[in-house]
C-alpha cells in the first residue's frame, strides 16, 4: 500500500498561486431603514445608525427627507416634498449626501424652489457647481470693514441709514407697511450698475420668498421683469402651501447662491422676506420632533437659526477676492412691538434696522421710515462724501421737527425759531416721500437733499414740494448737467459745485409756477414809502385845569 505523503511546500505554492490570481468582486453596500411614524411633514426612521446631521434620506417614490434629530436607534426627519404616499414600514435609504444646492450664473432670471429646482417652466438650469447649505461663515481675518456704498435709491435710507456692501440691514415693521417694497426698490436700483457691465459695480440679487402667497410672489416677479431687474435676480420661492421644511431651508438656499458669487470676487444682495415665517416654520418642526420648547414655544437654538444665516453676509478681504454678500432680512412685527422675541434677536445680530411704522404709512408718509428708531451701525463709512456732507443735518432737523410737532399739538404758543423749524421739517418730510418702484440715483438724491437742508425750499409751499423737486432735478439735468457728472465722478460737493447749485435753483425759482397759479418769485417788490410820506394820526394830550372846589381841598 502506497503511503500518502504531504509536502508542505506544494500546499504553500498552491495557496500563493490562488491568492495571487484571486480577484475580489465589488459588492454594493447600502444602508436601509424603515419608517416608524409619519405625519405633519415629519417622519421617524429606524435602522440607519451611520446617518449624518443634515444628510438627505430617500423615501420610496423618490421623496427626500432631511435628518435633523439623531437619537439612539431613531432619526427625526423633515420631509422635503409630498408626504402623502409615505407610510409606516416603508424603506428609507441613505444618500450619503449633505444637503446642497446647485449654484451659478445660470440661476439669474430664474425662479427656483428651496432645493434649487426650477419652477418657472423655462427648462433646466446649467449649474456651475453645488454648494452645501450648512457652511461656516467667513472668519474675522477673512473679512474687511464695510466701506463701499450699496445704493438703494431711497432717499431716506441712503441719507440717514446708509447700507454698505457686506452689511446686514434689518427691515422691520407691521404688515402692509411697505417692507417688501423697500427691498424690491433696492434690487431695481442696481439696474444701472448691471447695465454698466463692470463686475466691480454689478450686484447680483437673490430674493427669498418665505411663506408668501403665490400671487404675491408672481407680482414680485412681474415687477422685477417690468423694471428690467429680473435679468440679474434669482428668486427662491417657498410659498405658504409648501411644507415647513421648505420654509426652513429656503433662506439658506438663497444665501448659498449668493455666497457663490461672493467667493468669486463679485457682489451680491440677498433679501429674506421674511424671517418671521422661517422662525415659525422652525418652531413647528421642532415641536413635532419633540424638542424642548422655550420662550414663546420657540426652541432654544432659534437665535442660532438666524445668526448662522446672517453671519454669512460679509465683505471679504482682498486676498479672497474682495467680494461681498449684503443681507436685507425682513421681520414682521405685531402692533409695532419691536421688543418681541424674534425681532430683538435679529436686531442684535444685524448691523442696523429700518423701522417702518403703520401710523406714518397711514398718514401718507411713504416710505414710512421712523427716523428715531432706524439706525445704521456702518453709517457714514458707506456713504459717498457728497451725500455725507448734505445729509449731516437731515436726521437732526427731522428729529427736532418730530419733537416740536408733538409739543405744538398741545396748542402752545411757539416762538419764530420753532415755527421756522416746524415749517422746514414739514418740507423735509414731504421731500423724503417717494413713489413705489421709482428709485433715485445718488446724484439726484444729493441735489434734492441739499436743497432741503440748506433752506432753499423754505419759501415753497408744502403742497408744491414734490412737483418742485421733480421739475428742478429735470431742470438741472437739462441745463446744468455738469453738476450731476461732477458728483458721479468725484463723489464730492465742493464750493464751486455749491455755487453752481445756488445759481441753478435761483434761476429755476424765477420760472416755477405754484399750484395756485402765482409765480414763486415776484417780478419786482414795491419800493418802501418814506416815513415822512406816511399819513399818521396825531394824538393831542389835553390837560384839565383844576376847579376852584378841588383846589380848595
Curated annotation (Swiss-Prot):
One of its GO terms (cellular component) is proton-transporting ATP synthase complex. Signal peptide: none annotated. Its EC number is 7.1.2.2. It catalyses: ATP + H2O + 4 H(+)(in) = ADP + phosphate + 5 H(+)(out). The keyword Ribosomal protein does not apply. F-type ATPases have 2 components, CF(1) - the catalytic core - and CF(0) - the membrane proton channel. CF(1) has five subunits: alpha(3), beta(3), gamma(1), delta(1), epsilon(1). CF(0) has three main subunits: a(1), b(2) and c(9-12). The alpha and beta chains form an alternating ring which encloses part of the gamma chain. CF(1) is attached to CF(0) by a central stalk formed by the gamma and epsilon chains, while a peripheral stalk is formed by the delta and b chains. Produces ATP from ADP in the presence of a proton gradient across the membrane. The alpha chain is a regulatory subunit. CDD domains: ATP-synt_F1_alpha_C, ATP-synt_F1_alpha_N, F1-ATPase_alpha_CD. It is found in: Cell membrane. InterPro entries: ATP_synth_asu-like_sf, ATP_synth_asu_C, ATP_synth_asu_C_sf, ATP_synth_F1_a_nt-bd_dom, ATP_synth_F1_asu, ATPase_a/bsu_AS, ATPase_F1/V1/A1_a/bsu_N, ATPase_F1/V1/A1_a/bsu_N_sf. Coiled coil: none annotated. Keywords: ATP synthesis, ATP-binding, Cell membrane, CF(1), Hydrogen ion transport, Ion transport, Membrane, Nucleotide-binding, Translocase, Transport. Residues 533-553 have a biased composition (Basic and acidic residues). The lineage of its organism: Bacteria, Bacillati, Actinomycetota, Actinomycetes, Frankiales. This is ATP synthase subunit alpha. PANTHER family: ATP SYNTHASE SUBUNIT ALPHA, MITOCHONDRIAL. Pfam families: ATP-synt_ab, ATP-synt_ab_C, ATP-synt_ab_N. GO terms for molecular function: ADP binding; ATP binding; proton-transporting ATP synthase activity, rotational mechanism. Residues 527-553 are annotated as: Disordered. Belongs to the ATPase alpha/beta chains family. The keyword Thylakoid does not apply. It is an enzyme of class 7 (translocase). The record marks 374 as: Required for activity. It comes from Parafrankia sp. (strain EAN1pec). Gene3D superfamilies: 2.40.30.20, ATP synthase alpha/beta chain, C-terminal domain (1.20.150.20), P-loop containing nucleotide triphosphate hydrolases (3.40.50.300). It is a peripheral membrane protein.
Amino acid at each position: 500500500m502506497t503511503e500518502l505523503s504531504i509536502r508542505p511546500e506544494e500546499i504553500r505554492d498552491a495557496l500563493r498561486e490562488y491568492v495571487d490570481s484571486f480577484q475580489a468582486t465589488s459588492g454594493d453596500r447600502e444602508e436601509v431603514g424603515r419608517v416608524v411614524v409619519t405625519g405633519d411633514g415629519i417622519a421617524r426612521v429606524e435602522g440607519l445608525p451611520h446617518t449624518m446631521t443634515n444628510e438627505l434620506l430617500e423615501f420610496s417614490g423618490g421623496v427626500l427627507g432631511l435628518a435633523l434629530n439623531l437619537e439612539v436607534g431613531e432619526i427625526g426627519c423633515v420631509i422635503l416634498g409630498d408626504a402623502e404616499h409615505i407610510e409606516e414600514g416603508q424603506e428609507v435609504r441613505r444618500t450619503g449626501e449633505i444637503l446642497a444646492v446647485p449654484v451659478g450664473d445660470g440661476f439669474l432670471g430664474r425662479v427656483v424652489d428651496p432645493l434649487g429646482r426650477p419652477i418657472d417652466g423655462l427648462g433646466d438650469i446649467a449649474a456651475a457647481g453645488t454648494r452645501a447649505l450648512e457652511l461656516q461663515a467667513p472668519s474675522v481675518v477673512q473679512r474687511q470693514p464695510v466701506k463701499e456704498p450699496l445704493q438703494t435709491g431711497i432717499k431716506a435710507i441712503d441719507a440717514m441709514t446708509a447700507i454698505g456692501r457686506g452689511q446686514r440691514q434689518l427691515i422691520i415693521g407691521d404688515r402692509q407697511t411697505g417692507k417688501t417694497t423697500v427691498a424690491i426698490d433696492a434690487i431695481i436700483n442696481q439696474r444701472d450698475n448691471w447695465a454698466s457691465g463692470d463686475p466691480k459695480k454689478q450686484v447680483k440679487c437673490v430674493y427669498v420668498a418665505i411663506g408668501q402667497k403665490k400671487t404675491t410672489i408672481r407680482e414680485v416677479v412681474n415687477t422685477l421683469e417690468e423694471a428690467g431687474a429680473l435679468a440679474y435676480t434669482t428668486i427662491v420661492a417657498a410659498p405658504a402651501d409648501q411644507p415647513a421644511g421648505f420654509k426652513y431651508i429656503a433662506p439658506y438656499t438663497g444665501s448659498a447662491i449668493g455666497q457663490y458669487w461672493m467667493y468669486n470676487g463679485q457682489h451680491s444682495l440677498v433679501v429674506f422676506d421674511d424671517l418671521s415665517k422661517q422662525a415659525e416654520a422652525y418652531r413647528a418642526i421642532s415641536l413635532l420632533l419633540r424638542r424642548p420648547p422655550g420662550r414663546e414655544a420657540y426652541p432654544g437654538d432659534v437665535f442660532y437659526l438666524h445668526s448662522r444665516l446672517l453671519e454669512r453676509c460679509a465683505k471679504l478681504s482682498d486676498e479672497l477676492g474682495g467680494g461681498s454678500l449684503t443681507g436685507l432680512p425682513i421681520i414682521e412685527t405685531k402692533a409695532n412691538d419691536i421688543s418681541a422675541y424674534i425681532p430683538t434677536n435679529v436686531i442684535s445680530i444685524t448691523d442696523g434696522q429700518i423701522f417702518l411704522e403703520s401710523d406714518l404709512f397711514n398718514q401718507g408718509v411713504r416710505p414710512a421710515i421712523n427716523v428715531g428708531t432706524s439706525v445704521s451701525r456702518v453709517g457714514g463709512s458707506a456713504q459717498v462724501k457728497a451725500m455725507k456732507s448734505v445729509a449731516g443735518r437731515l436726521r437732526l432737523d427731522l428729529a427736532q421737527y418730530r419733537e416740536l410737532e408733538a409739543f405744538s399739538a398741545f396748542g402752545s404758543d411757539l416762538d419764530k425759531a420753532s415755527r421756522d423749524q416746524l415749517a422746514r421739517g414739514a418740507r423735509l418730510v414731504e421731500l423724503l416721500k417717494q413713489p413705489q418702484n421709482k428709485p433715485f440715483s445718488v446724484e439726484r438724491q444729493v441735489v434734492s437733499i441739499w436743497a432741503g437742508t440748506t433752506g432753499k425750499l423754505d419759501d415753497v409751499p408744502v403742497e408744491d414740494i414734490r412737483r418742485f423737486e421733480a421739475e428742478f432735478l429735470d431742470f438741472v439735468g437739462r441745463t446744468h448737467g455738469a453738476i450731476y457728472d461732477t458728483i458721479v465722478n468725484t463723489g464730492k460737493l465742493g464750493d464751486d459745485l455749491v455755487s453752481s447749485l445756488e445759481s441753478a435753483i435761483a434761476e429755476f425759482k424765477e420760472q416755477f409756477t405754484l399750484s395756485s397759479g402765482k409765480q414763486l418769485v415776484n417780478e419786482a417788490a414795491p419800493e418802501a414809502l418814506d416815513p415822512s410820506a406816511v399819513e399818521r394820526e396825531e394824538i393831542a394830550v389835553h390837560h384839565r385845569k383844576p376847579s376852584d372846589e378841588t383846589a380848595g381841598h
